């Protein structure tokens, strides 16, 4: 499809629906709540949900002691797709588009510890790898247990559905599926929300 105007044109507003994960019943009253405080520019097909926990006030407080580096994520609808094959090498990973500015690349390169907020951020940073540079592109990296992380040191994320690529990425980050299950059980027993 070719458009004769930008997707950001206000004329498209009446046709836009906020994409919600399959486990949330679609309700337009949720559209405002299901958006990060830093959602800009338009283009993402889904919210980077780990970022939903960050308010402007919390980000301001974090900025007082840590450096926050921003990148643009265009989360794809494939983020909700389950893995439908037992042979992971046959799974076709969804593609997500991103942009890393030169300022962000400099901050990342100067950092001794990178904490990613969300699995899409992990995929982007692991695709770009150190040394980072200004870059706009896409990633279809599929991170599964056994993957050796090269860019990201810690991860803030949500709970993920069984058989999802996101859960596999978290298992890889933790180190094993068994340890991920143990941590999920602990989190559920303690009433953690993410």
Predicted regions and their residues:
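Surface-exposed, charge/polar-rich loops and edge strands
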Residues: 1-194
